[in-house]
């Protein structure tokens, strides 16, 4: 059973009210998404506990909007934000991203999302977990359309996706004229590929030319030097 909280160096993530708990791949994502001094506004789509927003708040001075459909998860994220050092820059919106898009004209320097995945797999029977894991409430095309409209002309979007869904995301991006590239291949160990991170932009000027490989654990099941370097600012015992 997962703990009801996860303690980081600068903040705590309470997670007893949310279906999806803090996991290693999300932590890697939050620690490796590029942010710069020009990243003033960030949108976190499907924030859950607020983990990604909190990690990006620690890494930047940006103002961050976090959208979450599930009311319990949104309340948990609100509490986690309030108890963090960056509560004045973190804002939860309890609605679907489709509804949020309808009621705002705001565009963002950076958009991040760990979207629903395993669309072809069987559902668990747990409604909250199914909503978090499956694409019932957020289709790939809808997500990409929202990203296209809400991303600044010079902005960047990064999506943490299942390795089985990459073709669908590429096709959806092409349909709305977004440039898309595989930014990162994430491995649990040297041979076990677990996730892709996609990079989307409206232009190709600042697209990364080489895909990064990120390996979490070595053959002896210890964290790699790469992992320790990136997560040291967050994990207590690194």
Swiss-Prot record:
UniProt-annotated location(s): Cytoplasm
Keywords: Cytoplasm, Methyltransferase, S-adenosyl-L-methionine, Transferase, tRNA processing
Coiled coil segments of this chain: none
EC number: 2.1.1.223
Predominant cellular place of this UniProt entry's protein: cytoplasm
Signal peptide as annotated in the record: none
Function: Specifically methylates the adenine in position 37 of tRNA(1)(Val) (anticodon cmo5UAC).
Enzyme class: transferase
Short name of any one Pfam family annotated for the protein: MTS
PROSITE patterns according to UniProt: N6_MTASE
InterPro entries named in the record: DNA_methylase_N6_adenine_CS (IPR002052), SAM-dependent_MTases_sf (IPR029063), Small_mtfrase_dom (IPR007848), tRNA_Adenine-N(6)_MTase (IPR050210), tRNA_adenine-N6_MeTrfase (IPR022882)
An example Gene Ontology molecular-function term: tRNA (adenine-N6)-methyltransferase activity
Record protein name field: tRNA1(Val) (adenine(37)-N6)-methyltransferase
């Amino acid at each position: 059973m997962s703990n009801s909280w996860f303690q980081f160096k600068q903040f705590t993530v309470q997670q007893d009210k949310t279906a999806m708990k803090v996991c290693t791949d999300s932590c890697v994502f939050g620690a490796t998404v590029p942010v710069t001094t020009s990243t003033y506004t960030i949108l976190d789509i499907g924030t859950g506990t607020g983990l990604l927003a909190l990690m990006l708040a620690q890494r930047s001075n940006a103002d961050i909007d976090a959208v979450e459909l599930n009311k319990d998860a949104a309340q948990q994220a609100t509490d986690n934000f309030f108890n963090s050092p960056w509560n004045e820059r973190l804002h939860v919106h309890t609605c679907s991203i489709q509804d949020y898009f309808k009621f705002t004209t705001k565009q963002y320097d950076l958009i991040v999302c760990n979207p629903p995945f395993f669309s072809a797999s069987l559902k668990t029977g747990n409604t909250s977990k199914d909503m978090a894991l499956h694409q019932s409430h957020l289709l790939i095309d809808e997500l990409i359309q929202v990203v296209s409209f809400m991303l600044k002309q010079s902005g960047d979007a990064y999506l943490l996706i299942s390795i089985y869904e990459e073709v669908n995301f590429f096709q959806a991006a092409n349909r709305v004229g977004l440039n898309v590239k595989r930014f990162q291949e994430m491995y649990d160990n040297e041979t076990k590929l677990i996730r892709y991170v996609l990079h989307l932009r409206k232009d190709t000027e600042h697209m990364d030319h080489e895909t990064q490989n990120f390996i979490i654990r070595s053959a002896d099941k210890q964290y790699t030097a790469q992992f320790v370097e990136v997560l040291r600012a967050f994990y207590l015992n690194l």
